[in-house]
């Protein structure tokens, strides 16, 4: 099925693919974290009404620019402000935590909101070395299991939803991540490599290729092929950066300001950061080893709504996709809200062009 987005303003329900949103709860210059989190609440309510399929919260540590270090806490709050939309993590940075505790958290959420909870996990640290050391202070790095081992343990806890047999309550296998929900959280592995794709397939999880972090078309092609081959033909999801504006020129201007950097210190795994300043801070905090950092290619889907939908549909057809997770890489509230409303098809609002003075009222209107 193909469509011509220029012929009409199709609702999200009429598209040949599903759209979800990734929210990093960005703190715009001059505002507080409380204001950024209030906007996340408003945007979730808006996404629920507009027909977006999922709303995911990202995890970031020790940064004044992003307001959410604990997706599971914000998820619980957002559930109380929505009715239909699935809400989840995009994702929990599993290297920092006990898989058992993560399973407990998301089993509790799934018990509170059956059929509405997503659990996405990722390999990244979600912060710079100082926060990583603080989060992992109770672990001996030499004895810390690898990511695949942690993910497999988490999977076991999520899959075990029956009570242990009578008389075995004190056995190691009797451990349960209570409460045991009737419908478990839907698990996703977020990654940008063939290795991650194969791990997701091995676990029986959905795989999300993080094109908002890794824009390499070759890596995308290989990961999609690997996941489809190892999972029995399942389609992955694609997380993609998207900016929608009233004109292609306006969207291109917003997209041109975005940048990413890849940084590595010594033999430690490379990480991706959002600015040169973050790359330099990472090098300072990591200490030891020869530092390297370089710009990463960014590929943002941008333009008018019709242009963006056509490009997403082309990606859908090329890779056999069914769903996208949209990252709007804008901190400023005005263009970010306008981009999401345009994407949802609210053309009259976008034509009005909200002014900076209207941002607070706009956020309140989103919640209604």
Predicted segment positions?
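N-terminal beta1-alpha1-beta2 module of alpha/beta enzyme domains
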Residues: 1-85, 366-367
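An alpha-helical appendage that flanks or caps ligand/catalytic pockets
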Residues: 2-13, 140-176, 218-319, 351-354, ...
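Acidic (Asp/Glu)-rich catalytic clusters
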Residues: 11-14, 48-49, 75-83, 110-117, ...
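Flexible, glycine-rich active-site loops centered on histidine and acidic residues
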Residues: 14-33, 95-162
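Conserved, mostly hydrophobic/aromatic
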Residues: 19, 47, 51, 59, ...
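Hydrophobic faces of well-ordered beta-strands that scaffold small-molecule active sites
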Residues: 19-23, 55-57, 87-90, 117-121, ...
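Active-site mouth loops of central-metabolism enzymes
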Residues: 23-38, 92-100, 181-191, 296-305
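A conserved active-site cap/scaffold subdomain adjacent to cofactor or substrate pockets
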Residues: 195-213
